[in-house]
UniProtKB/Swiss-Prot annotation:
This is Carbonic anhydrase. CDD domains: beta_CA_cladeB. It is an enzyme of class 4 (lyase). Its cofactor is Zn(2+). It comes from Helicobacter pylori (strain J99 / ATCC 700824).
Length: 221
């Protein structure tokens, strides 16, 4: 019922604040960024990016997953939406946004017995996209008994995995090489509002203010 009351409030009051904007969006959209995030209710793309309607093209699924090219048929709607945003809508930026306390990432540390898989077969099948992270985690045994650090590491490895999966598609890789598309990997910390951006050169996640400074200094933002 809360959603209905909220919709009524929007319709009768909040819409008026953006009336001209919505009217301008009646027959066209020109978002500058494709934002791929988890379905988690605590991740609100327009809120954390300070954007208005029409600025973001949003794709959401459990774990902000992009299927690798070798498995694209297992999540055709996701990659088809990515292709549409890039090839037809013409976005110039693409952000993969992971987040803290991610249930999808946390699930790879749990034991998935056959009973659990039988109860939630679709979830079990989807989580298989995150399997490569398990191998990478073996390189960081120091975090195996530290829940918080292991969680952050898993979430960041996942964001990096999805960036690599994106680049397995020719139509994305070509645009990145030709500087027609910029791709970013974010890790959003829910309880603090902090966002960390993946640095492709250092292979570390850095506070976004550092990324902004670097890109402004290189006039590449």
């Amino acid at each position: 019922m809360e959603a209905f009351l909220g919709a009524l409030e929007f319709q009768e009051n909040e819409y008026e604040e953006f009336k001209e904007l919505y009217e301008s969006l009646k027959t066209k959209q020109k978002p500058h960024t494709l934002f791929i995030s988890c379905v988690d209710s605590r991740v609100v793309p327009n809120l954390i990016t300070g954007t208005q309607p029409g600025e973001l093209y949003v794709i959401r699924n459990m774990g902000n997953v992009i299927p690798p090219k070798t498995s694209y048929k297992e999540s055709l709607s996701t990659i088809a939406s990515v292709e549409y945003a890039i090839a037809h809508v013409g976005v110039q930026n693409l952000i993969i946004c992971g987040h803290s306390d991610c249930g999808a990432c946390g699930s790879i540390h749990l034991i998935h017995d056959e009973t659990t898989k039988a109860k939630t077969p679709y979830i079990a099948n989807w989580i298989q996209f995150l399997e490569p992270i398990k191998e990478e985690l073996k390189n960081h045994p120091q975090f195996s008994n530290h829940f918080a650090k292991r969680s952050w590491l898993t979430e960041r490895l996942n964001a990096r995995l999805q960036l690599n999966n994106l680049l397995s598609y020719d139509f994305i890789q070509e645009r990145v090489i030709n500087n027609e598309l910029k791709i970013f990997g974010w890790h959003y910390i829910i309880e603090t509002g902090r966002i960390y951006n993946y640095n492709f050169e250092s292979h570390f996640f850095e506070p976004i203010e550092e990324t902004i400074k670097q890109r402004i200094s290189h006039e590449n933002f």
